[in-house]
Amino acid sequence: MTKKQKKMLIRICIAIVLLLIAKFVPMPGVVRIVLFAVTYLVIGYDILKKAAKGIGNGRVFDENFLMAIATLGAIALAVYEKDTDLTEAVAVLLFYQIGELFQSYAVGKSRRNITALMDIRPDYANIETDGKLEQVDPDTVAVGSVIVVQPGEKVPIDGVVVEGTASLNTSALTGESLPREIIPGEEVISGCIDMSGVLKIRTTKNFGESTVSKILELVEESSSRKSRSEAFISKFARVYTPAVCCSALALAVLPPVINLIAGNPAAWANWIYRALTFLVISCPCALVVSIPLSFFAGIGGASKAGVLIKGSNYMETLSQTKIVVFDKTGTLTKGVFEVSGIHHNELENEKLIELAAHAECASSHPISKSLQQAYGKPIDRSRVSDIEEISGHGLTATVDGMKIAIGNDKLMEKLGVDCIPCHCVGTILHIAIDGKYAGHIVISDIEKPDARAAIAALKRTGVQKTVMLTGDTKRVAGQVAKDLGVDEVHSELLPADKVTQVEKLLAEKSPKAKLAFVGDGINDAPVLSRADIGIAMGAMGSDAAIEAADVVLMDDDPMKISKAIGISRKCIRIVYENIVFALVVKAACLILGACGIADMWLAIFADVGVMILAVLNAIRALAVKNV
């Protein structure tokens, strides 16, 4: 609880004690009125101050003005009727302040989730000078400098580890508690916490361009992007509040005047009381407070789960998503080539991989890297000679005195070697040794473990169609789509073709259905911007993704996509629940108040009670664990 909240709680407690004394302890009438007045000022002085300030600034009609007029009017009416019991007037402000405390707590809880994310901001960077560590401002560290990160410290700037090993806690960024093991040569991003081991990191970016700075900028700007619901409520309150003030004035004046004209008693006190009750009931704070709070809580809850939503307008659009389009590589697949199959003739698997890795040792192609990774041992280049690349076919080399040919079926055909066809999906590398077929190795982009479950989860959330876009061949793309359960696939696409394909899908869909595009942030910026909602996945370290996307998933777990949609739908559902509940209760109580059936206590419930219930409902948007 903040200092301000504690002060308010103390004021509420003092006001309750004073109110009970004034209500139930016998005392002279004048003393009772004075005690009620003191209680009123203890609990409501800030409301009176805000109302006066609003009038001075030309913003007359707000909830503070309504509360001030209604309660001061109730006090004046009681004094006029020589009634020393001012409980109703004081209770209106007391319960209003209790409602405000609830709201403040809810906002604080949401803000703490976002603040936990904001806590990734590093205060300093360590630079080693003459064998001693010197703490400097991260802004002053140049690209290419070597910084030192000790256990318990935050990584201040993106870079590459040049010395040391450690476990990094990335939970503030990804929402995942599992530590990430780091070794020399690996990239690290700012905002992670070093849990063990000293790291020396060569920076690859300035602090202002680092991941942590980009994310903090994104979070700070999220509250400025309003949804249609928030914009409507703001406009509604600007028209609604003056309208109810005029209605209350009419209710206080017109019926007594009509009574006088008709020759009946005016009953001014009765109609003024009804008008004051009408004012309290009509206060729009339940809507004005709970709607932005629901979105704020939703964004806070999402950030805790490693999902950054750039504003409530994007949350509203995300909740209406019916079509999800994936750029295959990096979202549904790992985007890393791996050896997925070895089919040999006479040689053992290990020997075939060893010869293939050595033959490909001079190539920088990803296929060569995947072979070396599968081999898992250092390459002895002294064993390799006479390397010759054959464009579009493969290469030949001599390894340990043996003539190795490795490539596609066209290479085997060119060399007159009969190869065995392979029906596996992926890149097939046929291998011949001294002119004799030795077998083949299958290299493919591996599907993510949760990719199939992620597609199924999207369909359970109500997504009507999933689409996969890829530059792969039709055969490979079709097999991946079939394995994962994707509804529609478009293959052999260039980056520009993906934009065209998304535009076609946008033209075909219904206006109410929204299309989300999911990419890994690499060359995806045009498509992320073109879709109704752009989702960048695994965006840690990708500036382009953070800039172009509307929703940023901080790790590469495809299950987070359905979670993001689920969070947004829960948030929007809560918003509509609060709107309907507040309007229905207020409308019913306004009618009862105008008819003289509702008293000030019912008015308190219609205002403060509804606001507290709406705020408590809004807090539910923070709970995202089981969404």
Describe each model-derived feature in a short phrase:
Residues F65-L66, A91-P151, A172, I182, ...:
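Juxtamembrane coupling segments of multi-pass membrane pumps/enzymes
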Residues P122, N126-D130, V146-Q150, I323-V417, ...:
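Cytosolic catalytic regions of ATP/NTP-dependent phosphoryl-transfer enzymes
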Residues A116-E209, N313-A356, T398-V399:
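Conserved cytosolic catalytic loops of P-type ATPases
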Residues G29-A37, V60-A68, E81-V92, F232, ...:
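Membrane-water interface of transmembrane alpha-helices in multipass transporters/channels
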Residues T2-Y124, K235, P242, I342:
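Transmembrane helix-loop-helix hairpins at the membrane interface
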Residues M1-I14, V34-A37, L48-I75, L216-A250, ...:
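Soluble-to-membrane junctions at the N-terminal ends of transmembrane alpha-helices
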Residues G56-N57, E63-T71, L173, Y273, ...:
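Conserved catalytic phosphorylation-site environment of P-type ATPases
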Residues G401, T427, I433-E577:
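Conserved ATP-binding TGD loop and adjacent catalytic N/P-domain core of P-type ATPases
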